[in-house]
Amino acid sequence: MSWIVNKQSSQEELAGRFRKLMSAPDILQIPGAHDGMAALLAKEAGFSAIYLSGAAYTASRGLPDLGIITSAEIAERAKDLVRAADLPLLVDIDTGFGGVLNAARTAREMLEARVAAVQMEDQQLPKKCGHLNGKQLVPIKEMAQKIKAIKQAAPSLIVVARTDARAQEGLDAAIKRSEAYIEAGADAIFPEALQAENEFRQFAERIPVPLLANMTEFGKTPYYRADEFEDMGFHMVIYPVTSLRAAAKACERMFGLMKEHGSQKEGLHDMQTRKELYDTISYYDYEALDKTIAKTVLPDE
């Protein structure tokens, strides 16, 4: 049913669902959804939560992931995803978009968008993708202050603290930072760019809160299955840019086909049909809002 007329979950309800999911015995798979259509397809596939990646969002706007977007911009996209799917959403808020006050403002914006959880990292600006070299980190105290500010500004918002320290300072330092972030109020920890099974297991042995793994493509982490992350002691796994990469490659192939053949006909088998599209976006639910609108009759495919 259309979100315009259907009762949707409150932020508190969505956060409560996310908290239960991340604490459940089975690992929580969280696919990235870079737009509303991807969010709907993730829900259709049976996922219980979705993720908004800063990298995927910026790329969807033709921009690099270098900290050049604003909190208001990503909050607007987050609102689209929650409206579309009514699923708990974990949002990548980079470094909090500035200092402590910026992090607090971001938290309030996420609350207004009905976001269930946020992920914040301990990099300095300009930040980089977590699987690239040359990252610089803020002091532990600064990251802890941001976490405290978020929890004060938006108590119901779940905070997943990401540390990029493994690459710059080593595994023990990453664990030490994580312990400080938990003390500051973080609800879960995201150790970025771990590179081997023993590293994941060490984190799980020493960190008492739910842990999130990043199964991005073309990164430093080997391609583990969800059940393998679960066996290593992790509670969540994200696939941050998968939807955008798949969509972009499909567009690239289709545009090449159109340019080569002067038509898209040869690629129709790779497209959503009109019926599939209408079913996904609940077209007829919207049309039913006005009984005077004639029901659309689909042409033969």
Swiss-Prot record:
Gene Ontology MF terms: metal ion binding; methylisocitrate lyase activity
InterPro entries in alphabetical order: ICL/PEPM, Isocitrate_lyase_ph_CS, PrpB, Pyrv/PenolPyrv_kinase-like_dom, Pyrv_kinase-like_dom_sf
Highest taxon of the lineage: Bacteria
Alphabetically ordered keywords of this record: Lyase, Magnesium, Metal-binding
One Pfam family hit: PEP_mutase
Annotated GO biological process: propionate catabolic process, 2-methylcitrate cycle
SUPFAM superfamilies: Phosphoenolpyruvate/pyruvate domain
Required co-factors: Mg(2+)
Residues annotated as binding substrate: S53, G54, A55, C129, G130, R162, E192, N214, M215, T216, R245, R274
Residue positions binding Mg(2+): D92, D94
EC assignment: 4.1.3.-
Reaction catalyzed: 3-hydroxybutane-1,2,3-tricarboxylate = pyruvate + succinate
NCBIfam families: prpB
PANTHER family on file: CARBOXYVINYL-CARBOXYPHOSPHONATE PHOSPHORYLMUTASE, CHLOROPLASTIC, PHOSPHOENOLPYRUVATE CARBOXYLASE
Record family assignment: Belongs to the isocitrate lyase/PEP mutase superfamily. Methylisocitrate lyase family.
Function: Involved in the methylcitric acid cycle. Catalyzes the cleavage of 2-methylisocitrate to yield pyruvate and succinate.
UniProt protein name: 2-methylisocitrate lyase
Native organism: Bacillus subtilis (strain 168)
Lineage: Bacteria, Bacillati, Bacillota, Bacilli, Bacillales
